[in-house]
Structures are given as structure tokens and as C-alpha cells.
Amino acid sequence: MKTIDELLSEGVAGKRVFVRADLNVPLDGTTITDDGRIRAVVPTVKALADAGARVIVASHLGRPKGAPDPAFSLAPAAARLGELLGADVAFAEDTVGSSAEAVVTGLADGGVAVIENLRFNAGETSKDDAERAAFADKLAGLADVYVGDGFGAVHRKHASVFDLPKRLPHYAGYLIATEVGVLKKLTDEVKRPYVVALGGAKVSDKLAVIDQLLGKADRLLIGGGMAYTFLKAKGYEVGISLLQEDQIPAVKEYIERAEKNGVELVLPVDVLVAPEFPDLKTKAPANPTTVAADAIPADQEGLDIGPETRKLYASKLADAGTVFWNGPMGVFEHPDYAEGTKAVAQALVDAPGFTVVGGGDSAAAVRTLGFDENAFGHISTGGGASLEYLEGKTLPGLAALED
């Protein structure tokens, strides 16, 4: 995989460089609530602009239905990128139409432009190879060189991620190079004990990665909504907690395999429960009760790991040589249910080894809860991409950059 440093050494002054970034940031109206993904692409964009390239930044945002939708415009992200660069960033109101052509034509050496949401074109996400290829051909007409730096999208077989690099000289940006280096530390160069903490709502989202980790990790800590399917598989009643009944047979098999492989599978010993899900808008006090994990009342749902579990998980992380954490331990968006996630984050900060926060909700939680991002070994920008890499899958966006 050729990297941006090789491109810079070849010289990029005056060249149109298409940077496939991941500017898929959460929005409240037009206000960006977490700009982590925009900040992550700044080193690549700045290096190219400083070297005199004409930089065209492209990304998706949300899931528009293959047509323009103002709610998913990249305009706020373009404005924020300009603020972070301390430079004017031009914005094209389409992706491959007259606005994009005019904006790209008008770029001076060292200039930066953002084109509108790639998913406003059905060809970006099409399952039809010919439709995707046709859109990639149009994108290729805008640029001379391709730099892949949207790690959060490399697991998608989309036109700008998979088809476009085949049409232009292609290089990995700083973010992708860093992310791949980190994931190699989690797969090929693991320092032990290797501890994995998994949370989040659905156990079905994590089954494939658990399958792989049962042969690699030393300890697996389970929290979040997915923990209740594990507790049910152990024969406990879980009240009205989130439960994926159809996954219980698979989870039972994983519990048995963990025992057979000598992997320590650690489940909550106590949880915070309440009769209903909290109001995340008003953040009104939820007044949860702490109960043992095997004594959840029939009319209550578990919404965070309890104080004993927090201590237990911290102790299991205390000597870790390598840690991968993906998914919050509870409904961290509400202050009454944030302590479990906070405890795991703090345990990662305190752990002596290399710690990775695996993107998505965990990365958002770390920022929301006020942790210093530099206190972790690495905070990934790709939740789904990280998981699929650890599952051993070939990621289309990385495969395209390898060719």
C-alpha cells in the first residue's frame, strides 16, 4: 500500500488530488455535535495543500436515499474543516455536476474544496457494478490522483471507496495508514494479556468478532445491552432488558468455547435497573436501583453495569498489555447510566499497555464524558470497519488501495 508520503515525495504541486475522507459527523440540525472525524483528516488535507495540491475532499454523511436531501448536506462539515485548517474551503453544491466542475476548476494550487454528499448519487452505494462504475468514472474526471483516508467507510464496496481508486494513481492517507498499523497491533503483534471489552446494544453486531476473538483474546468483558442476551444464555432472568432471543443458541456456544479455549469470559455481576428507558432529551433523574445480575426484577430493565461490575472490569483491565474496547457499557448519554462506560474508559487510561477505543459510540462516549483523547493509545474513527478487520474480513477500501 503506497502512502501519502510517497505521493508528496513525487511532488503534487498543481495536481488535483481527490481525498476520500469520512466526514460522517453527528448533526443536531446544522450543528456538528462531535467533529472528531473531521479533525482526523486534517493532517492529510493540510500536508497536500501545503505541498501545492488542489485538494478535493469527498465524503458521505448519513443515509440519504440516493438523492439530494438538505438534512444530510456536507456544508456544515466543509465550514468546520475550513476553521480547523485556518483557510477558506470552497463548497460545491453537487458531486459531479456543474457546481463541482466549477469549484474544482477554480481551485488554485494549495486550495481546498469539499464536494456535496456522495450518497446524493444512487451510483455511490449501488449494488449494480455498472451503475457504481459509471459514477466512479465521473468522479475520476475531477482528479489526477486518489488518496483514501476515510477509514470509517473502508468496509463499504462503494464507488468512491472501491471503484474510484482503480481509475487513478492511489495512495493511503495518514489516517488510514495509522488505523491499519493499529489494527495490526491487535492481530499480528499482540502484547499480552490481551483484554477486549465489548458493549453496545445488539449482540448480533458483535457475534462475528467474538467468534474470532475466542481464539486470540485472553479476557472478554461483556457489557451494554448485549450483556442481557449472555445473562439469559446463562439461565438468568433479565426482566424487560434488551434481549435477542434468536441469538441465545450462538451465545451459549460461545460461552462453552470460551471455557474450552481458556478465554476468561466476564459478565456483569450487578446492574442498574429501572422500569423504563430514560428520557435522553430532558435528562430527568431516572432513579435507578442496583441489583445482582441474577436477580433482575420482571418489570425492570438493565441500563448500565453496576458498581461491583465496574470494580471487577477495572481489575481485569489493570494488567492488560493490549486492550480493544468497542461499545458503551450502558446508556451513557444519560448521567444516571454513564458510570459504567466512564469506569471502563478510566481503566483504559490507567492500563499499562496499548489501548484502542474502537470507533463509533465508544469514541463518542470518550469525548462526551470529557476524557483527554491523548490518554488512550488510539481512538479509531471506524467502528464497523475496525470490527470487520478484526473479524478477518477483506475490506474493499483497503483492498483497492493495495492493488
Curated annotation (Swiss-Prot):
Superkingdom of source: Bacteria
An example molecular function term from Gene Ontology annotations: phosphoglycerate kinase activity
GO cellular component: cytosol
Keywords, ordered alphabetically: ATP-binding, Cytoplasm, Glycolysis, Kinase, Nucleotide-binding, Transferase
GO biological process terms on file: gluconeogenesis; glycolytic process
InterPro entries, per database record: Phosphoglycerate_kinase (IPR001576), Phosphoglycerate_kinase_CS (IPR015911), Phosphoglycerate_kinase_N (IPR015824), Phosphoglycerate_kinase_sf (IPR036043)
Family matches, as Pfam families: PGK
Top EC class, one word: transferase
Annotated pathway: Carbohydrate degradation; glycolysis; pyruvate from D-glyceraldehyde 3-phosphate: step 2/5
Binding site residues for substrate: D22, L23, N24, R37, H60, L61, G62, R63, R119, R156
Binding residue positions for ATP: K206, G302, E333, G359, G360, D361, S362
Catalytic activity: (2R)-3-phosphoglycerate + ATP = (2R)-3-phospho-glyceroyl phosphate + ADP
Documented EC number(s): 2.7.2.3
Compartment annotation: Cytoplasm
Subunit structure: Monomer.
Family to which the UniProt record says this protein belongs: Belongs to the phosphoglycerate kinase family.
Name of the protein in question: Phosphoglycerate kinase
Native source organism of the sequence: Streptomyces coelicolor (strain ATCC BAA-471 / A3(2) / M145)
Gene name, Swiss-Prot/TrEMBL: pgk
